[in-house]
Amino acid sequence: MKPGGFWLHLTLLGASLPAALGWMDPGTSRGPDVGVGESQAEEPRSFEVTRREGLSSHNELLASCGKKFCSRGSRCVLSRKTGEPECQCLEACRPSYVPVCGSDGRFYENHCKLHRAACLLGKRITVIHSKDCFLKGDTCTMAGYARLKNVLLALQTRLQPLQEGDSRQDPASQKRLLVESLFRDLDADGNGHLSSSELAQHVLKKQDLDEDLLGCSPGDLLRFDDYNSDSSLTLREFYMAFQVVQLSLAPEDRVSVTTVTVGLSTVLTCAVHGDLRPPIIWKRNGLTLNFLDLEDINDFGEDDSLYITKVTTIHMGNYTCHASGHEQLFQTHVLQVNVPPVIRVYPESQAQEPGVAASLRCHAEGIPMPRITWLKNGVDVSTQMSKQLSLLANGSELHISSVRYEDTGAYTCIAKNEVGVDEDISSLFIEDSARKTLANILWREEGLSVGNMFYVFSDDGIIVIHPVDCEIQRHLKPTEKIFMSYEEICPQREKNATQPCQWVSAVNVRNRYIYVAQPALSRVLVVDIQAQKVLQSIGVDPLPAKLSYDKSHDQVWVLSWGDVHKSRPSLQVITEASTGQSQHLIRTPFAGVDDFFIPPTNLIINHIRFGFIFNKSDPAVHKVDLETMMPLKTIGLHHHGCVPQAMAHTHLGGYFFIQCRQDSPASAARQLLVDSVTDSVLGPNGDVTGTPHTSPDGRFIVSAAADSPWLHVQEITVRGEIQTLYDLQINSGISDLAFQRSFTESNQYNIYAALHTEPDLLFLELSTGKVGMLKNLKEPPAGPAQPWGGTHRIMRDSGLFGQYLLTPARESLFLINGRQNTLRCEVSGIKGGTTVVWVGEV
């Protein structure tokens, strides 16, 4: 080496030695745990600013920082304001993975990042030789991450307040401007991407924080919201992280009406649009559907549409959709369900003598309401109208005032609406008495002798009453024998002692058999309607108190109390009930049953899958599978403090109405609403109280109680909405009520209600609210109630086409003519007739 070159190298070494010593002061000297790569990463960056400022600045920095000692994670720089040397936290560390645990409980990728974090936070963080933070993983939770983002926006608002013009914008636009401002501040190199190093530079100092961030830092933005996993955040991803979206919904799309035919599938698509739109949330009656495991709403598709696999009338109603986190902008979908007509005619066949009046009736149900037309032997009868022939109740009844031989024929009722048509035939034969055929004689004398009757279970056995003639057609005395066992119907406990029969509940099984409970004898009798005999007795658990027929599965459910204190209740099921003889008695697994409810069928809904059980003092209803007799789920009512007492159901909109037990004698028995689609409690049914009763077509809900002077009438619209028609105040509470089809207007109903303390009957026309009273009835049954419950004064109707109703008095029965709204007759000498069944055509 040349002598000059030697002295030059020596001079440079001497100039750089103080700077080198400045980085190795005792307070900052590196121990053996510091990687070589880290020191190399920190030192070159110490001169990053001075390189840009030229050689003179470089020499000045070397001279000034030579005596300035900076701790790890920082470097010496000249202050632009004062020109004096100062320590500044490192902007970044060279990427390397030598993980360590900090004394703050956090995990760091290397020592440099630990020291840099200590510098930025202004607190001491040392290396802990423990594996706890490795096992614990990242401590930043979703809750902490949400709090972090709120803090970032709050600090940004403090650092860069919105301008006057911006502050007048809506909150969503203000938030968008704030997030854009934060993004620009974080994007140090201005390339439109936030890297981990840029996010790491934005460390929140302790003095800026009003709340704990639960182990989160700005670097966690990459962990949670780097959707394309490219280790950087674009403005679009930054928008999504802070839920900044610009959503739109056209005014004409705010309410969308979708009409679908029952049994088909349908798709509801949300019209809320916008860049970066979050996932769509669907709700029904305020309950989120997306996360429920529903049988018929189970696929939301790639475009977040709502897919209903098989639409039924319970699905009708309102559905709303909105982008997650933006509930203020929502679309309402009104789902209307159309149902093709279903009709019944009455009678299917009749024979009349010339000169008498004849009526042919047709009942049709469907959505929209079907239109009815009549054909006689294929010809439209509307072209043959005369004084003799007329159409009543919007065409639902064809009336011939005086029949002639030429009126003989097949009369076809046709019901039609927008989605279908149905028809059935009612035949009319005109023959004088001398020309009666054997078939007509049998139809008149045999068929009518067992069908279209009230079967009354009284103190003196079983009494069959024909309402047209007001006569007792058949009387099965208590001493008559049971066909299969030869026991007496009502055995006497002591000789020469007359003891009344005791009945509590009876059901009609397909107009073939009547099942009736005898609580004191712990058995159920099976009455053969055609043979007019008691066929057999079925022994059940002690004190059977309630029977219910599940037509869909041909089962009779029997609730027994065990004793009068209901201390050992049980629920049994008699299968194959319509066979009359080959039944099986099955014990269900349910314990502590206080009551149960099986929804009724109707023309549109002919299959019921589920029933409901109430347990004593339990604020819940338990849903059971009627086929397997196994529990499915529990619908809790404890949030509403409701112990269920009674239930009703309408298939229109799928509502269950639950009557709660009274909290005190002075309080009213309020009601709750349950949605059968989601099995969720919707809340109180307004101010409605009392026991709910649903009309046969599911359109009207009438609520009343024996201890309340109020009667509430509600209607379900074709859109599945519950509307209160009116509330009536009456002088006495309602003991029981029955629905009667209107004879003046098709698809309308009236009710007849037995007053609790007065002998009168209340008549109400549901469509108009017109009220009347039927007087001159005798006092209702008196005395203490039976130990197994039940009302003293019942009301029983006579089926879909019947015009008669029955209610008991103390020692007689009263028959009401619903067509004429008058008292038909009184049948005397019948005591204890509070268990009654109507039997239609046999």
UniProtKB/Swiss-Prot annotation:
It holds the Pfam family Ig_3. Glycans are attached at N318. Residues 81-135 form the Kazal-like domain. Its main location: secreted. Residues 1-22 form the signal peptide. GO terms for molecular function: brain-derived neurotrophic factor binding; calcium ion binding. Disulfide bonds join C87-C119, C93-C112, C101-C133, C270-C321, C362-C413. SUPFAM superfamilies: 3-carboxy-cis,cis-mucoante lactonizing enzyme (SSF75011), EF-hand (SSF47473), Immunoglobulin (SSF48726), Kazal-type serine protease inhibitors (SSF100895). Residues 251-338, 341-426 form the Ig-like domain. This is Follistatin-related protein 4.
